[in-house]
């Protein structure tokens, strides 16, 4: 998986100072970024030319302080064929020697008015998400009250129908049938649709529905953090389901675990409302309000009072 230089330009709204069309088609294969400070002093032992080179005020100031011929020579060493692009932050003026070296070495020179630290963070975050390894899972990913909920279950259980009902209730569809999930960092999962399935949902007996066309742009979302997993399964009288919410399960994807709850599907149950309640209950727990703990405390208090009265 790779990202093209032109995609970075479009995402971060960079300005092109120098860049022939073919240079903007160069591939970026690493999310790491280099700020070439030591390299400008002539130390290239651990130089990583395959990364995007980002110059901020410090690097630019040192470069400008150098004699013109020295500036050109050090830039010639930095600009190698495998270098995707060079970005100059803060809207700083690109020296003529840099343009000359870029033309000779065929390297795109880009600029941004953003502060270096902010630009570095945005660039790293974008490349991390684009280059992260994807894991495809079967299910429906919904944005419910701003929280990403992954709905899974056996084939034919009604995942897509539940997703459509949630859309009608004002929530947003992220992905149906196939959800591509990646770890944005060590504790966060994100999900997005396959490009071919974007904004589409399949309903048995009806066919494929374009959710954006039918319900508007507010009914869809391109990606979402995955915070809760819901597993739908047929109701079985011989199986015990969690009734208090104290039997925690987890779903692990790409080394990151998220909580998962199991919801029994039975005639007459409004599953979309149950999932809404599950999402709100999870958010309440994250904010420190735990209904299960409150029930336990009330039950313990009631038992204690009864013991005193019966003593």
Swiss-Prot record:
Keywords associated with the record: ATP-binding, Carbohydrate metabolism, Kinase, Magnesium, Metal-binding, Multifunctional enzyme, Nucleotide-binding, Serine/threonine-protein kinase, Transferase
GO molecular function, one term: protein serine/threonine/tyrosine kinase activity
Domain characteristics, as noted in the entry: The Walker A ATP-binding motif also binds Pi and PPi.
Quaternary state and interactors: Homohexamer.
Biological role stated in the UniProt entry: Catalyzes the ATP- as well as the pyrophosphate-dependent phosphorylation of a specific serine residue in HPr, a phosphocarrier protein of the phosphoenolpyruvate-dependent sugar phosphotransferase system (PTS). HprK/P also catalyzes the pyrophosphate-producing, inorganic phosphate-dependent dephosphorylation (phosphorolysis) of seryl-phosphorylated HPr (P-Ser-HPr).
Family: Belongs to the HPrK/P family.
Name the record gives this protein: HPr kinase/phosphorylase
Source species taxonomy: Bacteria, Bacillati, Bacillota, Bacilli, Lactobacillales
């Amino acid at each position: 998986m790779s990202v093209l230089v032109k995609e970075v330009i479009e995402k971060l709204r960079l300005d092109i100072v120098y860049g022939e069309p073919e240079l903007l088609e160069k591939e970026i294969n690493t999310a790491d970024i280099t700020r070439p400070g030591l390299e400008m002093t002539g130390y290239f032992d651990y130089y990583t030319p395959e990364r995007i080179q980002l110059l901020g005020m410090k690097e630019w100031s040192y470069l400008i302080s150098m004699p013109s011929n020295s500036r050109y020579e050090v830039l010639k060493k930095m600009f190698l064929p495998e270098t995707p692009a060079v970005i100059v932050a803060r809207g700083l003026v690109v020296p003529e020697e840099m343009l000359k070296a870029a033309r000779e070495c065929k390297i795109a020179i880009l600029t941004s008015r953003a502060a270096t630290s902010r630009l570095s963070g945005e660039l790293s975050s974008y490349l991390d998400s684009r280059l992260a390894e994807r894991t495809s899972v079967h299910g429906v990913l919904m944005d419910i009250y701003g929280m990403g909920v992954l709905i899974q279950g056996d084939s034919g259980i009604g995942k897509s129908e539940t997703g459509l009902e949630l859309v009608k209730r004002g929530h947003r569809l992220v992905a149906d049938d196939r959800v591509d999930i990646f770890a944005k960092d060590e504790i966060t999962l994100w999900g997005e649709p396959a490009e071919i399935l974007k904004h589409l949902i399949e309903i048995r007996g009806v066919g494929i529905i374009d959710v954006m066309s039918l319900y508007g742009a507010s009914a869809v979302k391109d990606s979402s953090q995955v915070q809760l997993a819901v597993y739908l399964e047929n109701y079985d009288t011989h199986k015990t389901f969690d009734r208090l919410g104290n039997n925690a399960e987890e779903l692990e994807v790409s080394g990151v675990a998220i909580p998962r709850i199991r919801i029994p599907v039975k005639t007459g149950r409004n599953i979309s409302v149950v999932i809404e309640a599950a999402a709100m209950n999870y958010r309440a727990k994250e904010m420190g309000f735990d209904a299960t703990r409150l029930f336990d405390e009330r039950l313990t208090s009631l038992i204690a009072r009864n013991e005193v009265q019966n003593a």
